[in-house]
Every structure is written in structure tokens, then in C-alpha cells.
Amino acid sequence: MGMILTDEQQAILDGAKGETMAKVMKTLVMFGEAFHAEKMVPVTSRYNHLVTSFGLGVLQPVYDLMQQLIDAGAVSGQKFSADPRPLDPNVPANLLQQLVFKKFMYNKQDFYEGQLEKLGLLNKDAFTCTCYMSEVGNKPEQGEVLSWSESSAVVYANSVLGARCNRNSGIMDIMGSIVGYVPYFGLLTDEGRKATWIVKIETSKKPEAQLLGSAIGMKVMEDVPYVVGLDKWLGTELDDAACTYLKDFGAATASNGAVGLYHIANLTPEAKAQGEALIAEGARVYVIDDAELQRVKDSYPVVWKNRDAKPKLCFMGCPHMSLEQLKTWTDRVEQALAEAGRSKVCIPTVFTAAPAVLKEFDKTPYAARLKKTGVITSYICPLMYMNNPLCGKMPVITSSNKLRTYTTARYYTDDEILVQITKGGARA
């Protein structure tokens, strides 16, 4: 049985708003039918967020498609933010790496940003994977239906904000904005938001967000976990510290697995409201203790050519760092450098955050203090940087499990990273 469309939706499909709009609607209908959706529902958030922010030369079909939309006047019904820019002159790169970036990889960046502006880009600073930060301003309300695609933003919006969004693909995201509807299935439905895993946290200390997220993602894959025992370490209020933790935790669940929604007992909105009623019948159980986290960490392959190479670069901020993280890390780096008797970090280190967050950070005394330590701040996407084959060959370290998963970067915990960048690359 096919999808049941309203008269308005059927009219768009039949060409009432032109051939291009009909194609967009047909694409969404086919997408929905592939997942057995019975109907389309309105997109209700104020803004959208697009995953495709990078002007790779090989993405010509994307530019052709976007141009067709622009020419037909099929612009987004919502303004939107987009994932981070791939390039920043502040980030260290040698002449050859720069040549590859500008001439061979992201040689359509300016052209593509021009297309995004015509389609409905919020503003020139709206490039970040953490669009939900209050400084950026694209923060959906609980229950709103979204057409987002960036996996770390989708899982945050679903879990921490209680919005409703599937893990859409790039381009499919803007199509939902253009017609104003998305297929109703999966994480948009009450049933699809029920947990099929109970994850019990039995660690002796607060688990590393990126490591815990990785463990859960690899175990449950695309299922919904209900996490018990984490409120012992995070509390029961979604304050800045808890939201920052869940940002990094969620990104790891979404990239090391394919999690689009998690519930944290006594903390996230739906878990607070419904409790264990969110757990589906027959849910499986996964217990995480210190030994399990260590097992997961030890399982990561080291893909450097030379395992013992001295790191040449450190990236922090995948997803982009919060204002709270930038401040906390300024204190931590300063203190560790003082203990080591140094004034500057001994590995080139880049902290990445949203342009709007960096603007706020620059207004605080912390910005000058961080600059003194030699740490560089940037709005770049570290993943886009690492996709340059010449950069991928370098020994790069990170505390991001997402960056580890998608690139050659090597994962260390926050504490281990701090030792490496302040004490000369020594292991923690």
C-alpha cells in the first residue's frame, strides 16, 4: 500500500507548483515508501540545518541539483544553518597541503556558498555542526518536527531537546524544507522513540563522554538506548555542563554506531516525563563498567604509518566546542603548562567552535589567555581538514571519537590529550 497524501501534497506531486517541486515531492514520497511511511507530516521547526557545507570539486551533481532548485524558485521554506566550513587560513597547513585544499578539493567553496545564500542560508556565520548552541540560535523546541541531516545535531535535537527528526541524508534535508513536509516514520513516531536497549552504567568514576558514546554506539548500532545510572555523574538538570557532555556523547553514539536518539534516565526530557514507560518490551541489557570502557578503547586500531610517531597536530572540537568547554580548557591548559614549566603548548593545537561561539569567547578574558598558550581557535571542520590525503598522512591526535572513526586521527581521552600537548607528547 502506498503513502496516503493530503490533497495539497498530491497537487504538488501532480505538478501544481511546477515540475521541480513535483520532483522534490516525488523524491520525498519515494524516500518515505522505502521506510513504509504511511503519510507525510509538516516540518514545524523555525530553521533547518544542512550537512553539505563543503564545496568539493567532485560534487558537481549537487551543484547542478541546487541550481535547478534556485532557477525554479524552489527555495527553502525555512532559513537554515549548515555544517562547518572546510577551510581556515589560521589552521596549520604547508604549501602543498594548501594547494590540494584550494585547487583540487574545495575549489567550489565560494560558488557553493553563493548557492546556499540564494536557497536560504541564515547568515555568513551559520556554519557549524552545533547549530543548537544558544549563541548560534538554531535550537528547536520539544516536539517540533525537523528535516535535519547532520548526525550529531540530529541525535542532540532528538535526545536533549526532545524534537523529532530522522537521520536524513544530505540533500534530502533541504527537500523537506522546500515542500514543508517529511515522511512520517522512525524517530518521528512514538513507537520509534521507544528504547530497545537498557544500558546500565556501573563505572567507578564519571565515564569519558566520547568513550561511553562509542561503546554504546558500537553495541546498539541504530537502536534507541535507555541509559540508567549516568545521572549519578551528570545530575538531573540539563545545565551547560550536562548539555556539553551529551553533545560529545551523542556524536560518538551516532558515528561509532548509528544512534539517532537516546534517553538518559532522570535527565533528558522524554525520560523525565515518561520514565521506564519508554522501554520497549523485550529490551536487551548492556552493562558498562570500567573494564568494558577500557576494552572498547583498547580495540581502536592505530592507523598511523609509525605507531610511535610524535604527534604533529591536535584537534579538539568535533563536534564544535561549547563556550563552557573553551573556558574550561583554557584553565586546564594554563594549569598543566604551569606545572610543566612551559609557556606554550608543544604540539600545534586547534580548538574548533561555531563562529558565533568564538565571537562570544573573544569577548571574555579567556580568549587572550588561551592565545598566550599557543592554542589556535578556528571554525573549521576537522574532518574536512583530515580528508586531505596529505593531512591524513600526518600523525594527528584528538579526543573526538567521531574524528577517530572517520579519519586517521588517533583517539586519546581528554586527560591524555592534556598531557600530550603540555608535556611534550608524553603518554599519559
Give a label for each model feature.
Residues 1-315, 319-428:
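Non-transmembrane, aqueous-exposed alpha-helical and coiled segments at domain scale
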